[in-house]
Swiss-Prot record:
CDD domains: CheD. GO terms for molecular function: protein-glutamine glutaminase activity. Probably deamidates glutamine residues to glutamate on methyl-accepting chemotaxis receptors (MCPs), playing an important role in chemotaxis. One of its GO terms (biological process) is chemotaxis. SUPFAM superfamilies: CNF1/YfiH-like putative cysteine hydrolases (SSF64438). It catalyses: L-glutaminyl-[protein] + H2O = L-glutamyl-[protein] + NH4(+). The gene is cheD. Its EC number is 3.5.1.44. It comes from the Bacteria. This is Probable chemoreceptor glutamine deamidase CheD. Keywords: Chemotaxis, Hydrolase. HAMAP family: CheD.
Length: 165
């Protein structure tokens, strides 16, 4: 009997797992699922990022997992605290869809999915963490699950077969 658990994270949450546990999130539309992992230690973290910049926050307390500019570094720290090695970390991304069609009204502000992906990649580059695989953009929502033992990110998109990256 397996003792593996599937840890589920919601919107604007992040968590870390160690194999044999897996981690998953659903409802990735314009949000981005960021996975940072150390394959050699079989440890991984996932964040469900909702918005690109913490400057969009209202009020005094910022939920680091909600924003791309704060979630990536916070997730790296959690993975390292769980045994990940800074120089061995890699990233996989999914999400960042354009879920609705907008006219030119709003312009760049309405491209939340693309802006989320851009900011996540910017933060990963700043921290020297390579993106080794991604499934981003498009117009469909996604559910993802990462297995730190195999390093496989499984992606389920509406009306499509499960993709593994």
């Amino acid at each position: 009997m397996s003792t593996a658990q599937a840890v589920k994270i919601g919107i604007a949450e992040m968590e870390v797992v160690i194999a044999p546990n897996v981690i998953r999130t659903c409802g990735l539309g314009s949000c981005v699922g960021v996975v940072i992992y150390d394959a050699g230690k079989a440890v991984a973290g996932m964040a469900h990022v909702m918005l690109p910049h913490s400057s969009m926050a209202r009020g005094g307390v910022i939920n680091a997992a909600k924003y791309a500019d704060t979630a990536v570094e916070a997730l790296v720290q959690l993975v390292i605290a769980a045994g990940g090695r800074k120089g061995m970390l890699k990233a996989k991304l999914a999400g960042g869809a354009q879920m609705f069609s907008f006219s030119t009204v709003g312009g760049d502000m309405m491209r939340i999915g693309a802006r989320n992906v851009e900011e996540v990649k910017k933060q990963l580059e700043r921290l020297h963490i390579p993106v080794v695989a991604e499934d981003v953009g498009g117009h469909s929502g996604r559910t993802i699950e990462f297995n730190p033992q195999t390093g496989v990110l499984s992606i389920r998109t509406a009306a499509q077969e499960i993709k593994e990256i």
